[in-house]
Structure formats: C-alpha cells, structure tokens
Design a protein with these regions (language model features):
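Positively charged n-region of N-terminal signal peptides that target proteins for export
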Residues: 1-5
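Bacterial N-terminal signal peptides
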Residues: 8-19
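Glycan-recognition patch characteristic of GH18 chitinases/ENGases
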Residues: 25-133, 232
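Short, well-ordered coil/turn segments that N-cap beta-strands
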Residues: 29-30, 89-93, 137-139, 179-181, ...
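Substrate-binding surface in catalytic domains of secreted glycosidases
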Residues: 33, 60-76, 148-288
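Stable alpha-helical elements in mature extracytoplasmic
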Residues: 45-48, 77-81, 108-111, 121, ...
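Conserved, mostly hydrophobic/aromatic
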Residues: 52, 95, 143, 173, ...
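Glycan-binding loop/region signatures in secreted carbohydrate-active enzymes
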Residues: 96-99, 103-110, 256-326, 346, ...
Length: 363
C-alpha cells in the first residue's frame, strides 16, 4: 500500500512539474540532519546522523551596526556537540544563525535586516563566519532568518529590501566560504510573496545557486483541527507535496531539498499549549483522556485526540517510514528534524529517521 501511494504521488508531482523535465538522479548518500539546540537536554547519537546543525548563534547589531556574533547559551554545550566528531569523523557540523536574541548582553538592534542592508557589514559577517569555522573545525553555516520582510519575534524587518538583501547575503557568504564549507538555509514552504509594502520570504530561485541544500520546514504548516506535516492534505493550509512542488517549479534540484520532520505534536499557534514534545507524548499515552497514534490515510500522518476531540498531529515511526520511501522515490537529498532533545529516551524518532534514510528501497 505504501509503495502504491508513493508511486501515485510521484506521478502527480512529475506531471505538475512539466515542462521542467525529468527528476534528477538520486544522490548516493542522503542526508540525515539533526538540529541540536543550545538549551537541549541530550546530544544526538553521532552514528545515526550525517549532519548536525547547532542552534543557535545570534547577531550583535548595535544601533543598526553589525559588531559580531556569539553563540547562544553556554559554550560548554557547543564543545560537547563538536566533540561528537571524535566518535564519527565523517560527521558534518554546521552553525545555525537565528534572527532572535536570547543572550543577556544583547538586544535587538537591527538584526539580519540592518546587517544585510550594508555591503560592508555583509562581508564582515561572512568573514567572521569563515574565521569561526576555521577556529572550531566547523563544516559550514546555516541561516535561519525567519523571515525576510516579516517580523513576528520583535526583530527588525524591511519588506522593501530584506528579500533582495537576503540573496546578496548568501552570495557574500558563498564567496567567503568557498566550496570547502557547507552553506544552507531554513526554507519556508513557499517562495517569496508580494505584500502591500514590498516582499516577504526568500527569493528561492535567486538563492539556490549559492547553497548546498535547503532545510525545508515542512512542519507547522497548520494546527488543530488540521495536520501540521501531512504529505497530502485537502484540509490543511499547506502540505509536504505542495512545498516540494513549489521548490521544484522554481528549478530547485530535488537533491538540494531536505524534508523537515517535527519531533513534536502541533496543537495550536496561540502561544499557550502550542506543542507537545514526542517525549511527552510517550508519557501521555497512559492518560485515559488522550488517544495517540490514530492514523489518517489521506494525510499519511498520525494524530491525537483529547476527550474525543482532535488535539493535534505529529510524526511517529510509521509516518517517518512513509516519508522515507517518498524521499527516495522523488530523489530528495534527505531529511532534517527539529529538534533532537524533543525525542524520547530511546531516541525512537531519530532511529526511525536514520532507518528511513539508509534503507535499501530497491530490494
């Protein structure tokens, strides 16, 4: 049944992309990327990931002038993550930059919006990134500016110039990093869009030549009573198929796309009881008010009920297996998950992601 589902969606996507040509050949080695936060309570198993993005570093922009950047949280946590390379020398670790500010010695002084507006500040930031990579033996940089032309976390934004300047920033980063370092970004499920005051989001077509791959955040695409990370959903605001189709129509190679996997249930976006980590889900299964691992056949996703009402959707080993076959059938570059510490003590979802990426689907 899974194979029939995957093949049918594959045909639908292929048809929708005409006249863009045939699907790219599958890369031999797919990426299994874990986001690991500075505040997390566990480390990834370096033997069941290929890449780790350490989250986060933040910009220090004072009165619209870029000064430097620093890691969020304690450096000791970052050192622990970097030490994982001793257990797996092939492991790639990148530093992810956020638009938010959390360090006590910092404040919002313009952020990415102001820094990227200046050619001199862009180049200084790029040079600082290269120096940091060399100092720590990092493998690359990931930009998680969410999002150009928008502000929902108190950060500065300028819809008139942010999207254009984002492209210039990625260009300068690639020129500084060269081809020896990874450059990626956290991608929204849609391309740039026009607004009354300018544009929002990333100009994907303009940015893709500069990056090695895109971490497409195919989660939080809706909330209860709809599905947040469905492969296909006729009721959700967006779904995985729509996201991949959006990128493919812009000419993004399939092997540059990583599919995002949430390690949590999305209930709402109201700032109250918004998410439930997978490790909490495991504990809540003994609560008689909850029902977990219910299955929607169209969306190919599990969901939960609370007192017989739809509570939220999430991913589990079953849905990750379906997405794994889908990733291989389409020739995507792999997957990413947010985030490592939300998994249970047995690392159930991390192991499922590794199985989804490494399984031989040709047998």
């Amino acid at each position: 049944m899974i194979k029939n589902f995957v093949l049918s969606t594959f045909v639908v996507l292929l048809t929708a992309l005409c006249p863009f040509g045939a699907l790219a050949s599958q890369p031999q080695n797919k990426i299994c990327l874990a986001y690991c936060t500075y505040y997390g309570d566990k480390l990834p198993d370096p033997n069941i990931v290929t890449h780790i993005n350490y989250a986060f570093a933040e910009l220090y922009v004072v009165d619209s002038v870029y000064k430097t950047f620093k890691l969020q949280g304690n450096e000791s946590r970052f050192r622990q993550v970097m030490a994982l390379k001793k257990k797996n020398p092939n492991l790639k670790i990148c530093l992810a930059f956020t638009h938010t500010v959390s360090n006590s010695d910092n404040r919002q002084g313009g952020g990415f919006s102001k820094m990227s507006a200046s050619p001199e500040m862009r180049k200084q930031f790029a040079a600082d990134c290269l120096a940091f990579c060399k100092k720590w033996n990092l493998d690359g940089i990931d930009i998680d500016w969410e999002f150009p032309g928008l502000s929902w976390s108190g950060h500065a934004s300028d819809p008139k110039t942010d999207t254009k300047n984002y492209t210039l920033l990625m260009k300068d980063l690639r020129e500084a990093l060269g081809n020896d370092y990874i450059l990626s970004f956290a991608g929204y499920v849609m391309d740039m869009q026009s607004t009354d005051s300018g544009k929002k989001f990333v100009d994907i077509q303009a940015v893709v030549p500069y990056v090695d791959y895109i971490n497409i955040m195919t989660y939080d695409m809706d909330a209860a009573p709809h599905f947040q990370s469905a492969i296909i959903s006729s009721t959700s605001y967006y779904d995985c198929m729509s996201a991949i189709r959006s990128y493919a129509k812009l000419g993004v190679p399939f092997e540059k796309m990583l599919l995002g996997i949430p390690f949590y249930l999305r209930h709402s976006h109201d700032g109250l009881t918004t998410v439930v980590d997978y490790k909490q889900i495991v504990k809540l299964k003994s609560n008689p008010n909850f029902e977990f691992d219910l299955w929607d056949e169209e969306a190919r996703t599990p969901y939960a009920k609370y007192k017989d009402k739809f509570y939220g959707s999430y991913d589990n080993p079953r849905s990750i297996a379906v997405k794994g076959e889908w990733i291989h059938s389409l020739g995507l570059g792999g997957l990413l998950y947010w985030e490592n510490s939300e998994d249970d003590a047995d690392m159930t979802l991390a192991k499922a992601c590794w199985e989804a990426i490494t399984k031989n689907y040709d047998e």
